[in-house]
Design a protein with these regions (language model features):
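The feature captures the beta-strand-to-loop junction immediately N-terminal to the Walker
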Residues: 36-38
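Helix-to-loop junction immediately C-terminal to a conserved catalytic motif
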Residues: 51
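Conserved ABC transporter NBD signature motif
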Residues: 59-66, 79, 109, 113-116, ...
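ABC ATPase C-loop
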Residues: 145-146
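Catalytic Walker B motif of ABC-type/P-loop ATPase nucleotide-binding domains
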Residues: 153-157
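Helical segment within the ABC ATPase nucleotide-binding domain
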Residues: 168-181
Length: 238
């Protein structure tokens, strides 16, 4: 299967600080990658670098064969990079539906399809973003990213701070997205066990470099790897 996302020798960071000293990573269409690591290992920096909001010191990025290295974040979004940041960044002064129609691009992920996945959003379609609970805001952030009909979906700790019942609903939705095919996903998640059942590949970062890259079932069978790189088996730090 051809690579959908290709990162080659990426050196990136903030200001003069290099956080990623030379990242090389590829993802195939439909692949779901769980990105794990302790706090400060470069997970969010990698996500932000794909989005285009870090300083790039070197290296290249390609999406479906298209060189996006020098593209602005808005150009990358139109090219097919969907992003759900930790802060969610929904439009609080727009309604649920307006949040999605404002960015929607033609494709299989329509507003109505998002409503099928998140019935709660349909019930709140005329409510403003600032009237939603934290879980509803996260559903909206994911739904809005999907209506862009991205090729790559980036989710930075999508379940952080949410009630267990909402977490289960979100994980079920993420499973629906991955089964729909066509999109490759990178998910940063602080609880490894929570995400291993969803991902088919796991990458662990340490000091901005990949120290483990394997199928998720292999990591399940070797909890010592989680213990070694994350400190506590089954739990990944921010």
């Amino acid at each position: 299967m051809p690579d959908l996302l290709s990162i080659e020798g990426l050196r990136a960071g903030y200001g003069e600080a290099v956080v990623l000293p030379g990242m090389t990573l590829t993802l195939a269409e439909g692949q779901v990658l769980a990105l794990l690591g302790r706090n400060g290992t470069g997970k969010t920096t990698l996500i932000n670098s794909i989005v285009g909001i870090t300083r790039r010191f070197g290296g290249s990025l390609a999406l479906g064969g298209l060189d996006i290295t020098t593209m602005r974040p808005d150009q990358r979004a139109r090219a097919g990079i969907g992003w759900v940041p930790q802060e969610r960044n929904i439009f609080r002064s727009l309604t649920v539906e307006e949040n999605m129609t404002a960015v929607a691009q033609p494709g299989p992920w329509t507003v109505e399809k998002v409503y099928e996945m998140f019935p709660r959003l349909k019930e709140r379609r005329n409510n403003f973003g600032n009237q939603l609970s934290g879980g509803e805001q996260q559903m909206l952030a994911i739904g809005r990213a999907l209506t862009l009909n991205p090729k790559v979906l980036l989710l930075d700790e999508p379940t952080e701070g949410l009630a267990p019942i909402i977490v289960e609903e979100l994980l079920k939705a993420l499973g629906t997205i991955t089964r729909a095919g066509g999109i490759c996903s990178i998910i940063v998640e602080q609880n490894a066990q929570k995400i291993l059942g969803l991902a088919d590949r796991v990458v662990i970062l340490e000091r901005g470099a990949i120290v483990h890259d394997a199928a998720s079932h292999a990591l399940k069978a070797d909890p010592a790897v989680l213990e070694r790189y994350l400190g506590v088996a089954g739990a990944a730090a921010h």
